[in-house]
């Protein structure tokens, strides 16, 4: 009964944990690394074709984004997640594949002129579509059994529509251990979705620490702030441009604007228009509306029961096609434009910035975190000019930020979550935080609450039955010199072939004991395949 820590160790992104228990091999989360990497991540120590299943906490790419990649390498097992997470992953993984293929096409056009080797995306649309078929929707609070001796319960983590903490109970050799994976723990009193559900019993806890060293402070009045920005901008004849993450944050903005319109907080501008210019955001909003009763909080449900859609209001316009998007720029009325991506590094928001950033009447309102190195970060730090589509654009618009808005619990919320466990767990593993933050939070858990805690590096292996560390890895810093080049398309195809060969061997090993006539037919199929491809001209 072992756990190996793969990703989001001393880093925020790339969540992935590999478990061997009750004769099964499986993952909890399979996330993509995003932003700068500081430490090398251990590869999953098994051929993906040998994995039995995956448990998924939620749909964000840093938790789900590598699922198509392991599918491409042979993983064909079920992926258990809440129903809302299954629906969001359907659109988000396809969107991720589209972005990667588009980026590869762009880089290869540029690279061919410079004689550079071909850039290959991590996975294709075919891989994304394939893995989506393997999702198994699970209700909150109901125990499921993905394999004998393994039971799983999803409880609401309050971070994103469908997000969950996972309670995993394993029975092996007459012993039972309960492991809780926090997933991303939500901030209290977020609009629309419920607060996180506390758990009370676990032998081991793997918990996030994104804000493990800081408090969000007093909650601002978001509706008042947004009303003031819109009123002030419209009064001078401008428009409000909101770069926003398509899933989660966009729906929160719609929730706030519905209230602003209902309470007539913006005066003198009639039924002003609000454009949501993001196909992904529009699809996500539809999914939010499909999961009102299982995911919405009491305030949102109260609106629904009155026949009010919390995400709809007069003046709301959605744009799907590129022509729809371009047409917005010809609308000279004062308006609000909500568009992705939230950090302004991709998507239709860049076109809206090109058309609106120069005009001092307009306001660019940031409603989410802006990572170092992004266009959004440059704007909030006071850039006077920026490059957009090869052109220099002067920053004349007012740049504003909505303070304190976060989908993650702060340090106080994290402490309250872990304190809810009645008996102290044997061990708490602190992950999903910046390098120093994981160590700071682990020490705080030990010093203030008396918990046995550690912040493991990628590659650390822990024996859950013996409560002992089998191997404690050390962080290996990434340097530019050690960064491996992207494999060529031919190399990637060969790697996939090798992966399929390894999966075939796995199936062969599992076939021992089946009827002889089936074994004989299986052998003939393999013989025929070998005869077809074992040629001198290959």
Give short role names for the model-derived ranges.
Residues 1-55, 64, 71-252, 256-273:
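His/Asp/Glu-rich metal-coordinating catalytic cores
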Residues 94-99, 103-107, 221-223, 256-261, ...:
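Short secondary-structure boundary/capping segments
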Residues 100-105, 292-306, 387, 470-492:
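A polyampholytic, Gly/Pro-enriched intrinsically disordered region
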Residues 359, 434-479:
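C-terminal, active-site-flanking charged/polar segments
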Residues 387-418:
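Generic long, charged, amphipathic alpha-helical segments
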